[in-house]
């Protein structure tokens, strides 16, 4: 059970550490020593600072930012804040969190919240965030379920990102969108534009509602979509055009969800005419081996035969559009997006269950991104050791009886601080580039504002 330590003073926290009550970590994929090595040699602390601070000189965008640590024993510490990235790194090495989250910028330093009036302590701004979790597709994917993913079902996430990214740019004018793999089965979007960070809860709820199309089904089975009016909203028309091009490959071929009798019934339930459903059911009983792709085509074939007079082709066309949206439109955890004070796992954290790093993804390379090939923290440390051996001329390995300082020095020389000699390098460089572009625009906006105040 998670223990919240959100009301502790620094003195209290120091006492807990001194008494060793942070021990007793769960047996997981990543041990504390591995995490310490990762935080010391691989985590891009400086670039994380530049991303959140929007510049090289410390501002309240970083100094008044809330961080929350999840400790190895599942204790959860909120309202941490730091003056610079060195302090953040030092605390991470001290407490060795299994993960940490980023929250809003507050009106005062979160560490001082007990010494000021509650009315003066409130969140001011935070990136607008979105979360897509593969488990929300369990009713339409056949290859995996729960926390499992594979190369067949990950395209559900890929096409969802494509739909949302275009929407963020074209419908809202956002420019700086950081997509981050969650480490196991999902993806997070951080919209970092200044105007997005300043949105209040009401505005965030409106944007989340604008994007929410697929909702739960009280009766179970395939999820439903909101009652969509025709003609479709331009956002949905654009989204449908994107999704239709991927529907055959992702749904009909890779998932083949209607191959079985039970699966076929799920399709028939989504059709608005009982006579059409009955005719299709009889056809498939005669030929039960028909694939989902063939059954999808059968809808038009039976309708074109003229044997079903109770419904028009236009109604069926609309129904098929709705089915495409039901299966492929992005499924969002909207609660993540609705509130300014919501915390979200930081980029480059390590997922404790998979050991994979939560890497940022270049949107231009989203189609080729494979979550199963994302480096694990153990892979990265092995790469560092191998590179340190090469750099030192067959120097000491992690298996020899060298001291920890010798190992650290070897790793540090090879790593140059941010894992540039490992497979984390492309993700780190992309994050650096993203942060630099965000900083340039932030500075440009400030200069424009200053020029207007003459």
From Swiss-Prot:
Residues 385-420 are annotated as: Disordered. Pfam families: DNA_primase_S. Catalytic subunit of the DNA primase complex and component of the DNA polymerase alpha complex (also known as the alpha DNA polymerase-primase complex - primosome/replisome) which play an essential role in the initiation of DNA synthesis. During the S phase of the cell cycle, the DNA polymerase alpha complex (composed of a catalytic subunit pol1, an accessory subunit spb70/pol12 and two primase subunits, the catalytic subunit spp1/pri1 and the regulatory subunit spp2/pri2) is recruited to DNA at the replicative forks. Its EC number is 2.7.7.102. The lineage of its organism: Eukaryota, Fungi, Dikarya, Ascomycota, Taphrinomycotina. NCBIfam families: primase_sml. Mg(2+) 2 binds at residues 131, 133, 333. The active site is at residues 66, 131, 133. Mn(2+) 2 binds at residues 131, 133, 333. Mn(2+) 1 binds at residues 131, 133. The keyword Nucleus applies. Zn(2+) binds at residues 143-144, 150, 153. Keywords: DNA replication, DNA-directed RNA polymerase, Magnesium, Manganese, Metal-binding, Nucleotidyltransferase, Nucleus, Primosome, Transcription, Transferase, Zinc. A ribonucleoside 5'-triphosphate binds at residues 131-133, 182-188, 342-345. This is DNA primase small subunit. The bound zinc ion is not a cofactor. It is bound to a zinc knuckle motif that may be involved in sequence recognition and the binding of ssDNA. One of its GO terms (molecular function) is metal ion binding. Residues 389-404, 411-420 have a biased composition (Polar residues).
């Amino acid at each position: 059970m998670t223990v919240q330590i959100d009301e502790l003073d620094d003195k209290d926290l120091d006492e807990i550490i001194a008494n060793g009550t942070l021990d007793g970590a769960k047996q997981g994929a990543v041990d504390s020593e591995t995490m310490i090595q990762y935080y010391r040699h691989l985590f891009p602390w400086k670039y994380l600072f530049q991303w959140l601070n929007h510049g090289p000189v410390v501002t309240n965008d970083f100094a008044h930012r809330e961080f929350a640590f999840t400790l190895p024993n599942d204790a959860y510490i909120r309202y941490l804040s730091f003056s610079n990235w060195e302090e953040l790194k030092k605390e991470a090495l001290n407490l060795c969190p299994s993960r940490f989250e980023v929250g809003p910028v507050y009106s005062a330093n979160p560490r001082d919240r007990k010494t000021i009036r509650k009315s003066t302590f409130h969140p001011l701004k935070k990136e607008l965030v979105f979360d897509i979790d593969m488990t929300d597709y369990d009713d339409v994917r056949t290859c995996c379920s729960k926390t499992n993913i594979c190369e067949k079902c990950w395209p559900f996430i890929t096409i969802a990102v494509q739909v949302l990214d275009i929407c963020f740019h074209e419908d809202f004018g956002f420019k700086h969108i950081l997509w981050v793999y969650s480490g196991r089965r999902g993806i997070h979007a951080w919209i970092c534009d200044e105007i997005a960070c300043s949105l209040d809860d009401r505005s965030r709820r409106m944007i989340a509602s604008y994007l929410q199309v697929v909702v739960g089904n009280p009766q179970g089975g395939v999820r439903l979509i909101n009652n969509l009016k025709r003609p479709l909203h331009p956002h949905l028309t654009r989204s449908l055009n994107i999704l239709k091009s991927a529907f055959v490959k992702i749904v009909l071929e890779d998932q083949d969800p209607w191959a079985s009798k039970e699966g076929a019934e799920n399709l028939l339930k989504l059709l608005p005419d009982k006579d059409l459903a009955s005719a299709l059911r009889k056809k498939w009983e005669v030929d039960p081996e028909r694939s989902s792709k063939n059954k999808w085509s059968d809808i038009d074939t039976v309708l074109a035969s003229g044997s079903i007079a109770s419904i028009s082709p236009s109604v069926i066309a609309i129904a098929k559009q709705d089915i495409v949206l039901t299966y492929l439109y992005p499924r969002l955890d909207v609660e993540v997006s609705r509130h300014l004070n919501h915390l979200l796992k930081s980029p480059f954290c390590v997922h404790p269950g998979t050991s994979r790093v939560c890497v940022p993804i270049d949107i231009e390379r989203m189609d080729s991104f494979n979550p199963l090939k994302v480096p694990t923290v153990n892979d990265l440390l092995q790469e560092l050791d191998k590179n340190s051996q090469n750099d030192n001329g067959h120097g000491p390995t992690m298996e020899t009886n060298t001291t920890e300082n010798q190992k650290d020095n070897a790793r540090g020389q090879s790593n140059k601080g941010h894992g540039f000699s490992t497979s984390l390098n492309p993700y780190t460089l992309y994050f650096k580039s993203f942060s630099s572009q965000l900083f340039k625009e932030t500075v440009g906006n400030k200069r424009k504002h200053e020029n207007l105040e003459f």
